[in-house]
């Protein structure tokens, strides 16, 4: 029986379905057209899935946010030159990088009133670096984009990798999120066989 044209298409099952989260996310994506869409067809939907997966796994309650609190995230898909400028101006490093995160939430500051959206911050990806890294790693650009967005959003939620224990926690969470989508562990080679079975 043909589908009713008045009804929306069902969400496909499996790893492409949106991940449910207790925190509604208002996501603003800039730059998804043009070169980014050519690189990863459907990139806007892909990055939305990555954001929702990171929020669902990252537990915003650590900031004192209660389930149902709307979260706002801005995501910029741009090029190496723009990311290099951001990296130089805000981090003092005059070079491009794959992803930058600018967290807006501070655990020491008061939260907005109940029901008011909470700005988590901004994430920016550099296209040429993403392409180069994906080629070097032998993985699909779409999988690398998904991983970098997850990584960036986890930074907005307070995760970090400056200390070894923090890095293991963050990498373990990323690996679990990616695994649920069928993406291989990006840290397996760096971890080495002696740590392959460790609790991350």
UniProtKB/Swiss-Prot annotation:
| Region spans: Disordered | 1-22
Free-text comment on the cofactor = Binds 1 zinc ion.
One Pfam assignment: YbeY
The UniProt keywords, alphabetically, are: Cytoplasm, Endonuclease, Hydrolase, Metal-binding, Nuclease, Ribosome biogenesis, rRNA processing, Zinc
Compartment(s): Cytoplasm
Q: What is its main location?
A: cytoplasm
Where composition is biased (Pro residues), the residues are 1-18
Q: Which cofactors are required for activity? A: Zn(2+)
Tell me a GO cellular component: cytoplasm
- Show the InterPro entries listed in the entry: MetalPrtase_cat_dom_sf_prd, YbeY, YbeY_CS
Q: Where does Zn(2+) bind?
A: 151, 155, 161
For this protein, what is the EC number?
3.1.-.-
A GO BP annotation: rRNA processing
Q: What does this protein do?
A: Single strand-specific metallo-endoribonuclease involved in late-stage 70S ribosome quality control and in maturation of the 3' terminus of the 16S rRNA.
NCBIfam families noted in UniProt? rRNA maturation RNase YbeY (TIGR00043)
Q: Which family does it belong to?
A: Belongs to the endoribonuclease YbeY family.
User: What is the name attached to this protein's record?
Assistant: Endoribonuclease YbeY
Q: Organism, per UniProt?
A: Rhodospirillum rubrum (strain ATCC 11170 / ATH 1.1.1 / DSM 467 / LMG 4362 / NCIMB 8255 / S1)
């Amino acid at each position: 029986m043909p589908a009713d044209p008045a009804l929306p298409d069902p969400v496909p099952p499996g790893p492409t379905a949106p991940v449910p989260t207790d925190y509604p996310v208002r996501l603003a994506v800039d730059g998804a057209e043009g070169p980014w869409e050519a690189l990863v067809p459907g990139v806007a939907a892909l990055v939305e899935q990555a954001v929702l997966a990171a929020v669902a796994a990252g537990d915003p309650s650590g900031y004192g946010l209660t389930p149902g609190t709307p979260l706002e995230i801005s995501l910029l898909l741009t090029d190496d030159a723009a990311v290099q400028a951001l990296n130089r101006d805000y981090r003092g490093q005059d070079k491009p990088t794959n992803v930058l995160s600018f967290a807006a939430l501070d655990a020491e500051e008061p939260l907005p009133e109940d029901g008011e959206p909470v700005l988590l911050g901004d994430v920016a990806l550099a296209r040429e670096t993403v392409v180069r890294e994906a080629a070097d790693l032998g993985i699909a650009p779409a999988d690398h984009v998904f991983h970098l967005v997850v990584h960036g959003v986890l930074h907005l939620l307070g995760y970090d990798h400056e200390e070894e224990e923090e890095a293991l926690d963050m990498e373990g969470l990323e690996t679990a999120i990616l695994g649920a989508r069928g993406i291989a562990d990006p840290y397996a080679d760096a971890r080495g066989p002696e740590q392959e079975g460790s609790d991350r």
